[in-house]
Amino acid sequence: MTVHIHPAVDQGVKQGSGSFAGGTLVCKCQDRPVKVGIKGDVAHNHACGCTKCWKPDGATFSVVAVVPRDNVTVLENGDKLHVVDASATIQRHACKVCGTHMYGRIENKSHPFYGLDFIHPELFQEGGSAAPEFAAFVSSVIESGVDPSEMPGIRARLKELGLEPYDCLSPGLMDAIATSVAKSQQKAA
């Protein structure tokens, strides 16, 4: 039996073009869809097992990446957007009608990822954005209802797809967080 991760990777991870210049994210509404413009390619694209990220029906993981916040512009029907949870670190701006998360923004200027917005590359009208590179917060899928006995098969499938599974972020991103924290502590001393 094949373990389903996410429709964007279940048939294999499709590599990006290497020259993706950006595009338009579109929500799932047929009438007046929300459209968000993204300049440039995505970074740190990954499968995410956390329970906060939006994912399509039937997906075990979301697929999420980051872009500089200055590269994100609401193009159409922004009146349909609302923040899902105002108390969350990542302010997820979702369509009120279909529920699709269009972008997530960190407003806390001291957060290591401040200045980066989180997006779901599968929502691009255009193809060619950078491919998912790893899987983060893998154990968290248990919180969304996955039986713990399925975890070895899920981790094996992620590895088969070339998405190294982590129960936090990738080592490079964890290093970036630790570096940011260390710098802030040096300033405080």
From Swiss-Prot:
Q: Which UniProt keywords apply?
A: Lyase, Metal-binding, Zinc
The GO molecular function terms of this record are:
S-(hydroxymethyl)glutathione synthase activity; zinc ion binding
Q: Where do the annotations place Zn(2+) 1 binding?
A: C27, C29, C95, C98
Q: Where does Zn(2+) 2 bind?
A: C48, C50, C53
Q: Where is the CENP-V/GFA domain?
A: 20-167
What's its top-level EC category?
Answer: lyase
Give the co-factor note: Binds 2 Zn(2+) ions per subunit.
Q: Which reaction does it catalyse?
A: S-(hydroxymethyl)glutathione = glutathione + formaldehyde
EC number assigned by the record: 4.4.1.22
Give, as in the UniProt entry, the pathway in which the protein acts. One-carbon metabolism; formaldehyde degradation; formate from formaldehyde (glutathione route): step 1/3
What biological-process terms (Gene Ontology) are attached?
A: formaldehyde catabolic process
What domain of life does the native source organism fall in?
Answer: Bacteria
- Cited InterPro entries: CENP-V/GFA, Formald_GSH, Mss4-like_sf
Names of required cofactors = Zn(2+)
Q: Which NCBIfam families match?
A: formald_GSH, PRK05417.1
Q: What does this protein do?
A: Catalyzes the condensation of formaldehyde and glutathione to S-hydroxymethylglutathione.
Instruction: Tell me which family the UniProt entry assigns to this protein.
Output: Belongs to the Gfa family.
Q: What is this protein called?
A: Glutathione-dependent formaldehyde-activating enzyme
